[in-house]
Amino acid sequence: MNGPWTEWDHVLKVDPDKPLVDGETFEDVCQTGTDAIEIGGTLDITTEKMQEVVDACSRYDMPLYQEPSNPAVVVESDALDGYLVPTVFNAESAFWVAGAHKEWVRIDGPLDWERTATEAYIVLNPDASVAEVTEANTDQTAEDVAAFATVAERLFGQEIIYIEYSGTFGDTKKVAAAAAALTESTLFYGGGIGGYDSAYEMGAHADTIVVGDLLHDEGVDAVSETVAGVKDAHADGEI
């Protein structure tokens, strides 16, 4: 499992539906020290909004990926390094496990498979928009999370396992359980990373932390603190 994400400590997720902090630019965003930018969101996303962010970020030397929330908002652009497509392993609705993906292939025909990978989401915050939209069963123990991670890696060959707590800082025991269950896949974590300390704490368990709302709420300096936190955790041998 040798995708570029195996080398990432930090991913910055840009929501096309949310503005940057006043006075900040996408050049500033690309200078935060993050390893890659992922463009995506759950609500009110359109192709036009996606394209605007792709165009703005593509001017800078930064790995750039789209995370499409549904097939209708996929942007076909050579400026993108690729597509990271969520599949929600604990979704109650089959549409978010494979149905949306089937529709994408049916509508658009052969995809750019060389640039397309999936993220095996395990959604654990019941109050998050993604949990509501996908009807995720978020009532999972640490053992459940470890089992989902194992199934995603071993049975389905997923290269990225993504523990999603969007909107709140997650249970480190559950993230640690997922990490212990994996042997090759890269473990992403997203949710509630608000500064150096939280990035360091979760960096002790996850291979890669994903920061999103912080960019839009507090700005690029706050994001840079999270970059430092996770990189220090990994340098200190926490993972």
UniProtKB/Swiss-Prot annotation:
InterPro entries: GGGP/HepGP_synthase_I, GGGP/HepGP_synthase_sf, GGGP_HepGP_synthase, GGGPS_halobacteria. This is Geranylgeranylglyceryl phosphate synthase. The keyword Nucleus does not apply. It comes from Haloquadratum walsbyi (strain DSM 16790 / HBSQ001). It comes from the Archaea. Gene3D superfamilies: FMN-linked oxidoreductases (3.20.20.390). Sn-glycerol 1-phosphate binds at K13, Y162, I163, E164, Y165, S166, G167, G192, G212, D213. Its main location: cytoplasm. Pathway: Membrane lipid metabolism; glycerophospholipid metabolism. Signal peptide: none annotated. It holds the Pfam family PcrB. It catalyses: sn-glycerol 1-phosphate + (2E,6E,10E)-geranylgeranyl diphosphate = sn-3-O-(geranylgeranyl)glycerol 1-phosphate + diphosphate. GO terms for molecular function: magnesium ion binding; phosphoglycerol geranylgeranyltransferase activity. It is found in: Cytoplasm. GO terms for cellular component: cytoplasm. Belongs to the GGGP/HepGP synthase family. Group I subfamily. The keyword Ribosomal protein does not apply. Its cofactor is Mg(2+). Its EC number is 2.5.1.41.
